[in-house]
Amino acid sequence: MYSTSVNNFQYNNYSTVGTVRKTSVSNPADNKISPQSTVANKTLCAFTGSQNAIQVRTELASHEEKTKYKELLNVCPKDTKKQLNQLLKSGILLNSNSNDKSTTLDNLYKMVKTPRAQGLSNIDILAQTVNALADPHDITQQFGNIPDQYKVQTAKLNQGKAGEENVEHSGTCVASSIEFNLAQKYPAEFARFAQGLSSPEMSVNKTIKLANLADNTLDAVWLLNAFEVPYKANNFNNVELTFAPDKNAIVRAHIQTIDKDKLERSSVDVLMQSTFMQIGSQQSYDTLTDKRTGKFNQNDKGLIEFEKTFTESVVEDKNKISVTYQTVDENAKLVGYETDFATMKKQITDAINMGENVIIGYTQVNSDNTIINGHEITITGIKKSPDGKLIFVCNDTDDNMSKPVEYTEDYLLPKIHHAGLPQAVVGDEVKLVENWVEGLRTYKELKKKTA
């Protein structure tokens, strides 16, 4: 679902569709408070996912589990062995909060014992998956370079659009934020995705509740059809979706398997982010160029707010609401806010206290309050500073740092354009419009602009 105040624009397009509230606003660019980065900490934290009814197990119980664990230790690199031990001690390895109730261990074992897609390595997929689970802050959206021996091949695949395959600035911040959240909060499901997407089928199935997309079953089906996600209806309540990366993802994934540099995406990052971009872009994404088409977005990079929340909802099988906080006019000028900062702070804090991460979209403005840039990051925690104000602990997949970063409330709150929140957090504070209504409205607006 979406708030009625949604302004669906792509951050580097900045067209809005909706009335503008005339509210005065101070320039966030004048805020001199700088963000603070936390000290890098590579020790694994205990699993902090949404696990109210999930038993945390830290000991191998059955002969089968012991055998699988031993066989993984026999084949994985030295660093991965240490990380596997950490995953076991923290409860992540035996976590079974996945769509089919398989454990993280089950899926890691399958990565090693069954074939991978052509061009991928069993051990690399295992090592990269374990690393992401051990420290999700290592997940990045940074594209790697194309080695000389692959430049001719990738140029041909690019069908004559010379140079577009040399991606310098990635538009996968939404996808990588969703990937980070999946790894940190749902480790068994993350491993299940990594296993399926790297298999010869290069896909993963997921059963979701239609009620998490719309109150009415037919409206939920409309959304699935609009986003062109392959599905099979089991009944009037549930539907089985098939997620897959685009056809060129395997090229990037193979290159990152054999030529990954520091701070570049792993093969698993490539497959995950391509898949989430495919979901949000109506199956129109091209990993080779990092561009997309699709019916809801006039821009060829990234995902807009509506697409982002649909992707979050189906990946997590949760009713996520996109709440828009900033009011932006047709000239991409920040002219006000849809609510006060106290309400904004309360909603985000309530979500964090529920055990949820909050993916936010923030903007940067110039001296005239015109938006010049936008980005998606994830709020993972909250602390208090000595003066009593809040500090937001965040993850940014585009900052070239494998560690969290901290922002004061005075710095971050004025910059937040929207946030993906659980419906329970928002309650009656925001008047809601169903996903399918917002999608249809967005589609009609774009049709008018292109007519």
Where are these regions (language model features)?
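Active-site nucleophile-adjacent alpha helix/oxyanion-hole segment immediately C-terminal to the catalytic cysteine
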Residues: 55, 59-97, 101-297, 352, ...
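Low-complexity, small/polar and acidic-rich linker and loop segments
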Residues: 34, 43-44, 49, 61
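Active-site signature of cysteine proteases
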Residues: 6-31, 39-45, 54, 308-451
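Solvent-exposed helix/loop surface patches that form functional interfaces
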Residues: 301, 306
